[in-house]
Regions:
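Periplasmic/extracytosolic POTRA-like scaffold domains at the N-termini of outer-membrane
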Residues: 43-84, 134-161, 198-200, 204-208, ...
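Extracytoplasmic
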Residues: 33-35, 73, 86, 96-100, ...
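A mature extracytoplasmic/lumenal domain signature
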Residues: 40-44, 95-97, 105-109, 147, ...
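Structured, soluble extracytoplasmic/luminal domains of envelope-associated proteins
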Residues: 74-126
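Short secondary-structure junctions
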Residues: 66, 83-89, 164-172
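N-terminal membrane-targeting segments
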Residues: 1-69
């Protein structure tokens, strides 16, 4: 008798587990995306990307997840599409159990702005270019003159990193002018004088020597 009861209980338990598994599987398949939540990090300091920008990109690519089945939403495709925006440094898209797609976005950090006949763009802290925004102007050194993009992402990029790490010269230098022969002039924030740097070769040693001279 006890054995029969045990068999019946085990059978019922097995049936219950199968039913629950099937029920929740069907429920997950039927669940649709209820909301798209976007977090743009450092949005108070930088305004290159907004939530509406990202939503517009997804709609144009037919990737807007709202009201779509959660199982049909490909977060990798969403990330790939949004990374085409040159203002974005990193993005993570993921699903939540409550039927929400969340986007966490990091904007690029500009360290230099170039205005020349070759273009008007920023150089970011990773050494890549990014377009100028119509809604936000970054407070970074301005480069003008004869600036090729190759120079911008190599020598000028290294020089901008140096300025970021050197408080004295970062406070001094406001503009950089590049001549056709790649000779460089630095324009200070205060005064009418210019610093003739020459080429970017050994620029740190040149500026160290100049600072030593100014301190005499």
């Amino acid at each position: 008798m006890i054995r029969i009861v045990s068999i019946v209980v085990a059978t019922l338990l097995f049936c219950y587990i199968v039913f629950v598994s099937f029920f929740f599987r069907e429920m997950r398949q039927d669940k649709v995306c209820q909301d798209l939540q976007v977090v743009v990090k450092d949005s108070l300091d930088k305004h290159f990307v907004s939530e509406s920008d990202l939503v517009t990109i997804l709609k144009k690519a037919d990737l807007n997840p709202i009201k779509k089945p959660m199982d049909a939403i490909n977060t990798d495709r969403i990330e790939t599409e949004l990374k085409k925006n040159e203002m974005i440094a990193r993005i993570e898209a993921y699903k939540t159990p409550s039927g929400i797609i969340k986007l966490e976005v990091e904007q690029k950090i500009p360290i230099l702005r170039v205005i020349s006949s070759r273009g008007n763009f920023y150089v970011d802290n990773l050494g890549t270019t990014m377009p100028v925004s119509f809604r936000y102007v970054a407070d970074v050194p301005l480069v003008s003159g004869y600036v090729e993009k190759e120079l911008a992402v190599t020598d000028l990029y290294k020089f901008a990193l140096f300025l970021q790490e050197n408080e004295f010269w970062n406070n001094q230098i406001e503009q950089i002018y590049v001549h056709p022969d790649n000779e460089v002039e630095l324009i200070p924030r205060v005064g009418n004088h210019r610093i003739v740097l020459g080429t970017f070769d050994d620029f740190q040693e040149k500026l160290d020597n100049l600072r030593l001279f100014l301190s005499l």
